[in-house]
């Protein structure tokens, strides 16, 4: 996992070795000797099985994300709160709490690549994995749904200044590959918006990877929010967890807040005179 790679290597949940010879297996066991001494679970298989373990694991986690996002979309049309639903679901030991946070969809270098690879592999085998295929389709639709949330919040997008907080596909990384923020920004720009953005780590990479995006990258949260018609949280960085809403209210042009990660309680934000729109909650 990006951001926790060293920790994951030193103490993984399990070790999977795919090999065709005892020599190769023994080499891998020597590499992981310390972890094996900790009595961590180890699975030894042929190469094809090991590869499928990787794809199946990532596709399953991606499916959890797309699933909870679909439930959140339903909550937007009824008097149900996805935050409470996710918490209650996560308390079920058969489900678990991880990857049940709704938002703008998954990104990065693994989930998009592995889900698409698994779908293509299945097609080539004549055995389309329909659930994974739907997971990809749901995720592809997320930026458009998030764009509509912003549009419903402020109306006409043209000539509006919109602040994007978070560009990396997740916190604690500077990776902008397949980041949901990028497609959301593209849609906003295509509809005539002016974009100001801030990310604690990913702005340099974003400028390099997407030089065609007409974005004003700012040095901090508050400079990004100055003169804004709508503040949008896209990545749940800890830096965004303690925003000074009194200060924000004094510098924005229009007090509109779109929380695509449900970082804040709606009533709290509204108490400062902001409108609030989250994902799957009123």
Question: Where do the model's predicted regions map?
Answer:
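Structural/interface elements that position substrates and couple domains in central-metabolism enzymes
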Residues: 1-282
């Amino acid at each position: 996992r990006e951001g926790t790679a060293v920790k994951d290597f030193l103490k993984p949940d399990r070790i999977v070795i795919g090999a065709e010879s005892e020599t190769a297996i023994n080499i891998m066991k020597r590499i992981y000797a310390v972890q094996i001494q900790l009595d961590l679970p180890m699975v030894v298989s042929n190469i094809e099985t090991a590869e499928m373990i990787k794809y199946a694991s990532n596709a399953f986690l991606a499916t959890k994300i797309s699933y909870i996002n679909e439930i959140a979309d339903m909550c937007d049309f009824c008097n149900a709160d996805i935050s409470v639903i996710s918490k209650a679901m996560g308390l079920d030991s058969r489900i678990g709490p991880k990857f049940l946070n709704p938002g703008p969809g998954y990104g990065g270098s693994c989930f998009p690549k592995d889900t698409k690879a698994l779908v293509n592999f299945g097609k080539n085998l004549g055995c389309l994995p329909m659930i994974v295929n739907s997971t990809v389709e749901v995720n592809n639709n997320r930026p458009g749904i998030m764009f509509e949330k912003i549009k419903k919040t402020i109306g006409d997008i043209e000539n509006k200044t919109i602040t994007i907080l978070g560009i990396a596909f997740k916190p604690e990384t500077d990776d902008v590959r397949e980041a949901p923020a990028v497609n959301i920004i593209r849609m906003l720009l295509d509809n005539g918006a002016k974009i100001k953005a801030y990310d604690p780590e990913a702005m340099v990479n974003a400028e390099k990877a997407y030089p065609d995006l007409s974005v004003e990258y700012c040095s901090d949260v508050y400079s990004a929010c100055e003169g804004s018609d709508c503040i949008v949280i896209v990545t749940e960085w800890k830096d965004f967890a303690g925003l000074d809403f009194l200060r924000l209210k004094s510098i924005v042009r229009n007090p509109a807040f779109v929380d695509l990660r449900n970082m804040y309680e709606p009533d709290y934000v509204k108490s400062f005179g902001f409108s609030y729109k989250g994902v799957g909650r009123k």
